[in-house]
């Protein structure tokens, strides 16, 4: 039997789409719109893997489906091309990251085109293109002008051997991932973005989004809003004046606060530590600087800490309490100090037991000899709070603290401001100049883009600055008006910057005068469907929402949120249910599949594997099965000589009415909910029915091809042209169904004589009771059963049964 030649057909239609710009999006500002967005990829050296097309195929199906429904569809693709791997490659090989990136993009683009996605390539963006990052820099200037970008001393991961600062992800167990060199925490001047200013909005507006609840919860936990009180403890020390400020969600337990713990980096530590403890404290601070935040807060690890020799005064009980330092308290969270209530907190209890510190019970209900009690109960040993339950005690405690000027009600966030600068070459230059008189200004907007200088010397500066610090022609500037000397900022932006706003640039990618035309932004925003991996659930999506909200407040974008509906595709695993990885040698290259089975088969298979959000193992058998289905479709419609099968006719003998209308209904509903696997099952049901009948009604097979085309577009176009159509299937109207034909016209009724089954007869649905009786009585089997008997009565139940009582 003849199967279709995928290599030939797929190449033919890809060329056709390219030449005719079939998927070019026009800004028909009045037309109903649909914006389908993929998370644009980082173009790595490895090229596309089979995980990429899963999400891309889903958005492509929806884009093609919406075009057929008469929507103006925006479906673009671009490249998130700054970032560490390219720089790493440049460091290792001495090659320019630009060349490396360009080559990788060419590979990715070829692979993506070979999969038949309906992108409008005229809107392609690349974060490393100066015409693009001009606007990334412009947004930074707006953030700066709004007071949302500032310089701060921040503890960073400093690796002396590599001469550079590393991100948390690049540090493993206190050493650099690359080379295994020791890494220390060291304060350095960094650019920080004030995302905390938007914490409440970022939290509240999640409620209006059509996102998976699990993902919203991840963002809620990351923002981590908690209500409580700020409490001040005076340091009991004649030489060192000072207050230790703590944030607590349980100010009602303050009478049980038997010691304070400061982070080793806390500003007060050095001034309050007494002489006899100075050496121990210093040694502990050095040790702590070698650990990442993650290691320091690991619940499973043994608690460590040292006493500073200093005491503070509990503001309500008046008791003296010891001040300790311990690495499980982070300087970056809350105030960098905690009041420890060991009787009612597991971590504090463990610490108090280890260092033999007092444990004071202030809520009854547990046995603090054995463990901390974290439940509810009446307050005891708590002065004016005695006898009160939880909520009432919190309110009263805050009142008492306020009266003494020692505290107040406060909301705290786990969310920290966003550390924005990187000591790297391959990123957007930050458009700021530091002048010799100590002031700093942003680069004038008309001078943007501030270009990343080309250099063959990409190596760490050794000072903790980026490699840009080595390039004098870039760094040194003189103000033409005043003659004042200045130095450009040498840090660059993180990879997150370009991906924070790329979806806006697709809307107007060639605009030289503004980020995007306000009318176009009004037409296209928000993004209607955004599909990508769950690994970006928190950072990318939170940062993009933050920038969008700033742009909304500046009047640049018309919506409060960027992405209305978001969906995470699952992961495609290797055949043995393991994650695909180069080291395991189980990575599947889509190029091989396109060659052997065809792009349509790959697309169909990845959608048919299971629910779009599930993690599913790759299976060659499943892939072969998907190809067999497409071959079956081809053979049903096309003769060996390539002509249309005579089985396809223009008269309707009604045999496929029900299954066709059911198929249109099911596929339409499933596409709306991204249930592609069940939609494909229904398409298979339809084809099976077509094989059982002698004739297939042409409008039904045309409707079928329209439903198949978004999933398998090349074979869809080819079959559409075989059906005698000259234009592309892309903008053909989506099929509709007739409710009345979803059910059979005929029903099968049961005929009983004296309660025993005597016949099953097919009759028209609307047959009257009288007609049902006549039909039943004229049936041969029934006649034989009642021969020589008197009919006492006949009961007819429409569409169900006829019961004859005879004696």
UniProtKB/Swiss-Prot annotation:
Its EC number is 6.1.1.4. Keywords: Aminoacyl-tRNA synthetase, ATP-binding, Cytoplasm, Ligase, Nucleotide-binding, Protein biosynthesis. It is an enzyme of class 6 (ligase). A motif ('KMSKS' region) lies at residues 579-583. One of its GO terms (molecular function) is aminoacyl-tRNA deacylase activity. It catalyses: tRNA(Leu) + L-leucine + ATP = L-leucyl-tRNA(Leu) + AMP + diphosphate. GO terms for cellular component: cytosol. Pfam families: Anticodon_1, tRNA-synt_1, tRNA-synt_1_2, tRNA-synt_1g. A motif ('HIGH' region) lies at residues 41-52. Transmembrane segments: none annotated. ATP binds at residue 582. It is found in: Cytoplasm. Gene3D superfamilies: 3.10.20.590, HUPs, Isoleucyl-tRNA Synthetase, Domain 1. One of its GO terms (biological process) is leucyl-tRNA aminoacylation. NCBIfam families: leuS_bact (TIGR00396). Belongs to the class-I aminoacyl-tRNA synthetase family. This is Leucine--tRNA ligase. The gene is leuS.
């Amino acid at each position: 039997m003849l199967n279709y030649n995928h290599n030939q057909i797929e190449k033919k239609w890809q060329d056709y789409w390219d030449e005719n710009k079939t998927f070019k999006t026009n800004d028909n500002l009045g037309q109903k719109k649909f914006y389908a967005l993929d998370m644009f990829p980082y173009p790595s050296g490895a090229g596309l893997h089979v995980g990429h097309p899963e999400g891309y195929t889903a958005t492509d199906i929806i884009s093609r489906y919406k075009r057929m429904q008469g929507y103006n569809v925006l479906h673009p693709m671009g490249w998130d091309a700054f970032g560490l791997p390219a720089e790493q490659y440049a460091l290792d090989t001495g090659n320019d990251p630009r060349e490396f990136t360009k080559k990788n993009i060419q590979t990715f683009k070829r692979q993506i085109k070979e999969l038949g996605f309906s992108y409008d390539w005229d809107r392609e963006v690349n974060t490393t293109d100066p015409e693009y990052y001009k606007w990334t820099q412009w947004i930074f200037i707006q953030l700066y002008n709004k007071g949302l970008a500032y310089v701060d001393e921040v503890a960073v991961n400093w690796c002396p051997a590599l001469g550079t600062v590393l991100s948390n992800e690049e540090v493993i167990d206190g050493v650099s991932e690359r080379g295994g060199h020791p890494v220390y925490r060291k304060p350095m001047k960094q650019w920080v973005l004030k995302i905390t200013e938007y914490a409440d909005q970022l939290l509240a507006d999640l409620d209006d989004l059509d996102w998976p609840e699990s993902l919203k919860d991840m963002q809620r936990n990351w923002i981590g809003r908690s209500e409580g009180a700020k409490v001040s403890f005076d340091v009991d020390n004649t030489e060192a004046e000072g207050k230790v400020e703590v944030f607590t969600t349980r100010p009602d337990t303050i009478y049980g606060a038997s010691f304070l713990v400061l982070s080793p980096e806390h500003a007060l530590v050095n001034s309050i530590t007494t002489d006899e403890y100075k050496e121990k404290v210093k040694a502990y601070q050095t040790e702590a600087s070698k650990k990442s935040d993650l290691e320091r807060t690991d619940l499973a690890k043994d608690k460590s800490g040292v006493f500073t020799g200093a005491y503070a005064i509990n503001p309500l009980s008046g008791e003296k309490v010891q001040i300790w330092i311990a690495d499980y308290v982070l300087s970056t969270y809350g105030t960098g100090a905690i009041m420890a209530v060991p009787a009612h907190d597991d971590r504090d209890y463990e610490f108090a037991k280890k260092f033999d510190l007092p444990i004071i019970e202030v809520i009854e209900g547990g046995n603090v000899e054995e463990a901390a009690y974290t439940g509810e109960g009446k307050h005891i040993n708590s002065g004016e709070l005695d006898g009160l339950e939880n909520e009432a005690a919190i309110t009263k405690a805050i009142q008492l603290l306020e009266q003494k000027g020692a505290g107040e009600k406060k909301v705290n966030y786990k969310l920290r401001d966003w550390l924005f600068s990187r000591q790297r070459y391959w990123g957007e230059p930050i458009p700021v100049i530091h002048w010799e008189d100590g002031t700093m200004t942003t680069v004038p907007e008309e001078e943007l883009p501030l270009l990343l200088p080309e250099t063959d010397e990409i190596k760490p500066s050794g000072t903790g600055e980026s490699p840009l610090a080595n390039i004098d022609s870039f760094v040194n500037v003189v103000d033409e008006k005043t003659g004042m000397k200045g130095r450009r900022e040498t840090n660059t932006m993180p990879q997150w910057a370009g991906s924070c706003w790329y979806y806006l640039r697709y809307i107007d990618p060639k605009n030289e005068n503004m980020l995007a035309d306000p009318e176009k932004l009004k037409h296209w925003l928000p993004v209607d469907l955004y599909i990508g991996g769950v690994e970006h659930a928190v950072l990318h999506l939170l940062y993009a929402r933050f920038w969008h909200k700033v742009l909304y407040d500046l009047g640049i974008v018309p919506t409060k949120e960027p992405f209305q509906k978001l969906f995470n595709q699952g992961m495609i695993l290797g055949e043995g249910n393991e994650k695909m990885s180069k080291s395991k040698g189980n990575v599947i290259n889509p190029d091989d599949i396109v060659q052997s089975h065809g792009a349509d088969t790959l697309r169909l298979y990845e959608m048919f594997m299971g629910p779009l959000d599930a993690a599913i193992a790759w299976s060659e058998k499943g892939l072969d099965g998907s190809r067999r289905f497409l071959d079956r479709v081809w053979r049903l419609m096309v003769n060996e000589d390539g002509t249309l099968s005579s089985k396809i006719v223009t008269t309707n003998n009604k045999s496929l009415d029900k299954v066709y209308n059911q198929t249109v209904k099911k596929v339409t509903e499933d596409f709306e909910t991204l249930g592609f696997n069940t939609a494909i099952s229904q398409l298979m049901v339809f084809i099976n029915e077509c094989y059982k009948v002698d004739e297939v009604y042409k409008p039904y097979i045309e409707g079928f091809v329209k439903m198949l085309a978004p999933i398998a577009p090349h074979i869809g176009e080819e079959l559409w042209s075989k059906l005698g159509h000259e234009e592309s299937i892309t903008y053909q109207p989506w099929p509709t169904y007739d409710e009345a034909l979803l059910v059979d016209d005929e029903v099968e009724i049961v005929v009983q004589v004296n309660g025993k089954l005597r016949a099953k007869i097919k009759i028209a649905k609307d047959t009257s009771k009288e007609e049902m009786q006549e039909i039943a009585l004229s049936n041969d089997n029934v006649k034989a059963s009642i021969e020589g008997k008197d009919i006492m009565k006949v009961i007819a139940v429409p569409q169900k049964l006829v019961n004859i009582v005879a004696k």
